[in-house]
């Protein structure tokens, strides 16, 4: 075996030695776009040297290709360490492509940090002296808040505070008409007008907070007053944003130039921002400006005010007077000892129809939009980059083939992390896009809901070995067919939502072929300890394979919302109340949704727009063919086998939470009327599985585990999560694991150290 490995290694060395060397171009902050870019440093006469911008390097490559053709080894553009300021993204088109054997690579010089920034430094500060402004400031902020003239920096456009295109689930409420999944199999809808990405403020590379109140938590709605009542399965509210608020704090907001509120107005998983139209101080009544929230408003929901000069009351908050172009800021420390930047550029790279282009080892930060967008093309890579402090997403990929995001660190996004969309769903032809070995965390800073760390939609995409944590909503959202999710670690997400999932998909019988395996999901509880799911297959989602996963302290690890043909096997559940949930919602409140799909199938021969009884769907997913003849509303075909359900060696979490003795009944939550439809086989329930070291978080099984006799297969737990290689942006990787809040009692929660990668 060793001899074989040596032979292979030798062949690889020979291959590497004979491969054509790439042509090199150099870029440096002190370069000159009139130079050739063939020298890494300026010559003695300073007549030649590196280029100053990536755009000039791109143009030089275009010239090379026109005169002598693409070099056999491709081209490497090496960026020296230093700061590169962007006003607009670099545009790369089909003419800027490489080939599989001769790629175009833009990379940082080894050992140096090439910092691409869309920010502008703000250095000219002065104290606030205007009596009218001082009068509006919180007493604690007077003398602490400073101001800067953004117009003097040429910054006159500040973006919008209103609704971004918001990904929201359709027909989770009965009063929303279902439109069906789109061509890529996504059941998420883009609602609202497109807006200009907004300016943000950063201090010493940390995002600061647009002034808000409360600084933590929310204000409750005490009563709704809108004239148009709504009733969603007994949950009552109104359509208009007209309500009584608790407390008296909004009294301070009267007279604000541009006051806004952001709230969860009807459901805990759907937010929207509104401009305040009026406040009646005597009645404590607020009206918000239309358009109103999609789902309406109801008593007991929560909101906060923002963009309020009067609410700069703690260090780190800021406000922009958009009419005068003045930034007001309470710095966390004396501003002369720090660095203040405001975001200006929309992003850094925009690839359209480009192929075989790699961005490697670059640090991209402080932009209003998405750092890298890739549209169509093939074989492009974002490798080992750090993408942070972005207004929207880190990387988006739309269409094309085999694009990849590998080994990146991504955090501080206003939206999500990596969005992968591609493949031909009608033909079930895979795109082959992938996200691997990325560390994605602290995202959803601005768009709180449905901005996941990873979003996959289409056919044949893969997410593997990613570490995702600390977010208000989901880690992974997906739609389409034939995706693979494996070796990912997820914790402490869904922190500001109820009824959500760390991994979520929903609402179709045809979104089949997905494999969710060898993932570690832990410390997931939702807002205030409310309902949160590990893997959430919502509203009739069908035919996922959930195997070899480890769930630790997840309130509801696997949730099947009335779907069919799902396989849950060979998983480990530790300290997880109601480890498996399967309901029959299509036989009840979700019946109208199912009826709509059945009607579509009978009248058009399609389900969700696809011809499910014809190839390729009929051959790839045979159970679809006879779906209508097999009581489609019933959750048939679900299998739960060879799983380990263990309350843990500490106090039984289920007994404490549900007030019942630790009997087998509490390991699941299956609707009684459909329990006979679910196949249960060879599960190990509340019998010590004999983990190697449970308290240290090692859930491998010892040789004497009783699970082996049931046919349990080894889970490669040691391979889950990030791994070290030349493509990783950083190593080691440390991440703190947050504790489980109430209602889970502290004595039922064991301390789990962060996993050092």
Report each predicted region and the residues it spans.
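Extracellular polysaccharide-degrading/modifying enzymes targeting complex plant/algal/animal polysaccharides
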Residues: 22-376, 381, 388, 396, ...
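The right-handed parallel beta-helix/beta-solenoid scaffold, focusing on the short coil/turn
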Residues: 23, 73-75, 82, 88, ...
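Extracellular beta-strand solenoid repeats
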Residues: 78, 85, 91, 105-107, ...
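Predominantly extracellular beta-rich ligand-binding scaffolds that present long acidic/polar faces
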Residues: 87-95, 101, 105, 543-557, ...
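Short glycine/acidic-rich loop motifs that flank beta-strands on beta-rich extracellular proteins
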Residues: 88-89, 368-373, 391-398, 414-420, ...
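Beta-propeller domains
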Residues: 292-300, 306-310, 332-357, 365-375, ...
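Right-handed parallel beta-helix
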Residues: 355-365, 378-391, 401-415, 427-444, ...
């Amino acid at each position: 075996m060793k001899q074989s490995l040596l032979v292979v290694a030798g062949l690889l060395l020979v291959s590497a030695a004979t491969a054509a060397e790439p042509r090199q171009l150099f870029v440096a902050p002190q370069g000159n776009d009139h130079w050739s870019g063939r020298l890494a440093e300026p010559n003695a006469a300073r007549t030649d040297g590196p280029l100053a911008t990536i755009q000039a390097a791109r143009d030089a490559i275009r010239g090379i290709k026109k005169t002598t053709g693409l070099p056999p080894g491709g081209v490497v553009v090496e960026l020296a360490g230093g700061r590169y300021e962007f006003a607009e993204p670099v545009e790369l088109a089909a003419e800027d492509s490489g080939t599989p054997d001769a790629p175009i690579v833009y990379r940082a010089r080894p050992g140096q940090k090439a910092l691409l920034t869309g920010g502008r430094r703000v250095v000219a500060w002065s104290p606030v002296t205007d009596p009218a402004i001082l009068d509006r400031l919180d007493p604690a902020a007077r003398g602490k808040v400073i101001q800067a003239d953004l117009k003097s920096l040429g910054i006159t456009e500040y973006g919008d505070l209103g609704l971004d295109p918001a990904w929201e689930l359709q027909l989770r409420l009965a009063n929303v008409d279902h439109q069906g999944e789109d061509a890529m199999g996504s059941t998420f809808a883009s609602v609202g007008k497109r807006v200009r990405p907004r300016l943000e403020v950063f201090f010493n590379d940390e995002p600061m907070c647009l002034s808000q109140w409360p600084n933590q938590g929310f204000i409750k709605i005490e009563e709704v007053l809108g004239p148009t009542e709504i009733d969603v399965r007994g949950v009552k509210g109104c359509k208009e944003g007209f309500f009584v608020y608790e407390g008296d704090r909004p009294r301070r907001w009267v007279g604000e130039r541009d006051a806004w509120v952001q709230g969860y107005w009807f459901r805990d998983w759907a937010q929207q921002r509104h401009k305040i139209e009026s406040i009646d101080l005597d009645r404590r009544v607020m009206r918000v400006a239309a358009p109103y929230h999609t789902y309406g408003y109801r008593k007991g929901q929560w909101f906060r005010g923002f963009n309020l000069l009067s609410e700069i009351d703690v260090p780190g908050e800021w406000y922009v007077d958009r009419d005068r172009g003045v930034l007001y800021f309470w710095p966390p420390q004396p501003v002369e000892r720090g660095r203040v930047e405001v975001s200006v550029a929309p992003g850094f790279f925009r690839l359209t129809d480009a192929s075989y282009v790699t961005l490697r080892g670059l640090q991209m930060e402080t932009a209003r939009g998405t750092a890298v967008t890739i549209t169509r093309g093939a074989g492009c890579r974002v490798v080992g980059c750090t993408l942070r402090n972005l207004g929207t997403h880190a990387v988006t990929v739309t269409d094309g083939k085999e694009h990849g995001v590998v080994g990146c660190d991504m955090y501080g996004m206003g939206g999500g992390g990596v969005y992968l969309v591609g493949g031909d769903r009608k033909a079930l032809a895979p795109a082959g896009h992938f996200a691997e070995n990325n560390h994605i965390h602290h995202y959803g800073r601005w768009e709180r809901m449905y901005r996941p760390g990873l979003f996959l939609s289409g056919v044949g995409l893969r997410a593997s070995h990613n570490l995702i944590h600390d977010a208000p909503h989901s880690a992974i959202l997906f739609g389409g067919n034939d995706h693979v999710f494996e070796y990912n670690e997820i914790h402490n997400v869904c922190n500001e939502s109820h009824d959500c999932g760390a991994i979520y998909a929903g609402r179709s019988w045809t979104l089949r072929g997905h494999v969710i395996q060898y993932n570690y999901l832990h410390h997931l509880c939702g807002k205030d300890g409310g309902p949160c799911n590990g893997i959430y297959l919502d509203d009739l989602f069908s035919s996922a394979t959930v195997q070899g996963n480890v769930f630790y302290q997840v309130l509801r690890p696997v949730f099947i919302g009335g779907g069919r043909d799902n396989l849950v096997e060979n998983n480990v559940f530790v300290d997880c109340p109601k480890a498996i949930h399967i309901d029959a919602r299509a036989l009840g409140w979700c019946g109208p949704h199912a009826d709509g799909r059945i009607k579509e199938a009978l009248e058009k021969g399609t389900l969700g727009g696809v011809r499910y009884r014809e190839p390729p769907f009929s051959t790839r997913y045979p159970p679809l063919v006879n779906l209508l003849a097999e009581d489609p509303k019933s959750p048939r075909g679900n299998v739960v086998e060879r799983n380990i359900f263990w309350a843990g060696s500490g106090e039984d979490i289920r007994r404490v939470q549900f007030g019942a003795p630790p009997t087998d009944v509490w390991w699941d939550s299956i609707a009684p009327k459909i329990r006979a439809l679910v196949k249960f086989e060879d599960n190990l329930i509340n019998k010590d599985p004999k983990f190697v070291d449970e308290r240290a978080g090692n859930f491998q099984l010892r040789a004497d585990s009783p699970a082996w006799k049931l046919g349990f297969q080894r889970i490669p737990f040691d391979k889950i999560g990030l791994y070290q290689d030349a493509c990783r942006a950083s190593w080691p990787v440390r991440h703190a694991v947050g504790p489980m809040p109430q209602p889970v009692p502290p004595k039922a929660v064991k301390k789990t150290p962060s996993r050092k990668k």
